[in-house]
Amino acid sequence: METRDVITQLKFAGIPVRDQDRAVQFWTEKMGFKVVTDQPMGEQRWIELSIRTSTTRIVLFTPPGHEDRIGSFFNGSFECDDVEATWRQLSAKGVEFVKPPKREDWGTSAIFKDSEGNQFVMSSG
């Protein structure tokens, strides 16, 4: 009997934000993501962003009661072809890096901050 995967992909990953407008500006203008959904949701908005080459969406939304997550470390990694080139490009746009590119046995990584103080790994290899 053939079995199928019950879970087929990661639909979205949430990034907690305090100021949704400021976060949208950061992720679209500096990171190059595109807004695909922006609709009211309670006292906030449900904002989904797409990355050009990925089916997984990024959601800029903080569930009530989880504001303590804003400004924390995102346990995941954004993949790029060349960390050093991307680091130079994003640094020129004003993106703050807390760790410059570093080569490891498994590849290269750097850590940057978004407009809300959240930290993210960017990696290749």
Regions inferred by a protein language model and the residue ranges of each:
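Helix N-cap motif at beta-to-alpha junctions
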Residues: 19-20, 80-83
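Short, charged/polar surface micro-motifs in flexible loops or helix N-caps
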Residues: 52-57, 65-67, 83-85
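Eukaryotic phosphotyrosine signaling hubs
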Residues: 10-12, 73-76
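Short glycine/serine/proline-enriched coil/turn segments at secondary-structure junctions
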Residues: 41, 67-69
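Core segments of cupin and vicinal oxygen chelate
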Residues: 7, 14-56
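Short amphipathic alpha-helices within nucleic acid-binding modules
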Residues: 26, 84-89
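Vicinal oxygen chelate
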Residues: 1-6, 12-15, 36-37, 45, ...
